Amino acid sequence: MLKVEERYTNAVPELQKFFNYGNIMQVPKLVKVVINTGVGEAVSNSKAMETAEADIVAIAGQHPVVTRAKRSVANFKLRAGMPIGLKVTLRGQRMYDFLNKLFFITLPRVRDFQGVPNTAFDERGNYTLGFKDHSVFPEIDFNKIEKPRGLEICIVTTANTPEEGKKLLELLGMPFSKD
């Protein structure tokens, strides 16, 4: 099985031919992968942020940045500046290692997995994938989970259209649904 990096070197000529690029620098490539999660219960339970951080470190292999509330919301007992989430940006080799794990280990572990939806592209060819439960990642011990936590994975590319981004991710091994 080829890794994502090796698949990219094989995909460059195919993308150049498919989209009729005149210059090899026009071929879309991966820029970064951003993993983020909201920890809303951190307002009332300070330990929730620590456990979420430990889970993100296990999944990404890198310490996350704490995201804070921009403004106060009285209904949620939230004040501006309070920690409400975590995010990690992966680039370079860590990005490729994470995508290998995501495409070939994690996604096949999802129950009743039929492929990722084709509709999650933005207008610039970036793809966002959401998980309702982070326990599908092999680094997370299912017995130690206090509460299932959702997270988002945003794959940022240099593609200009959703079609370019889809073709790039398809050639890299992203399992899209058939419909």
From Swiss-Prot:
Keywords linked to the UniProt accession: Ribonucleoprotein, Ribosomal protein, RNA-binding, rRNA-binding, tRNA-binding
Gene Ontology CC terms, in alphabetical order: ribonucleoprotein complex; ribosome
A Pfam family it matches: Ribosomal_L5
Superkingdom classification of source: Bacteria
GO molecular function, one term: structural constituent of ribosome
A GO BP annotation: translation
Protein family: Belongs to the universal ribosomal protein uL5 family.
Cross-referenced HAMAP family: Ribosomal_uL5_B
Summary of the function given for this chain in its UniProt record: This is one of the proteins that bind and probably mediate the attachment of the 5S RNA into the large ribosomal subunit, where it forms part of the central protuberance. In the 70S ribosome it contacts protein S13 of the 30S subunit (bridge B1b), connecting the 2 subunits; this bridge is implicated in subunit movement. Contacts the P site tRNA; the 5S rRNA and some of its associated proteins might help stabilize positioning of ribosome-bound tRNAs.
Subunit field text: Part of the 50S ribosomal subunit; part of the 5S rRNA/L5/L18/L25 subcomplex. Contacts the 5S rRNA and the P site tRNA. Forms a bridge to the 30S subunit in the 70S ribosome.
Protein name, as recorded: Large ribosomal subunit protein uL5
Organism, scientific name: Dehalococcoides mccartyi (strain ATCC BAA-2100 / JCM 16839 / KCTC 5957 / BAV1)
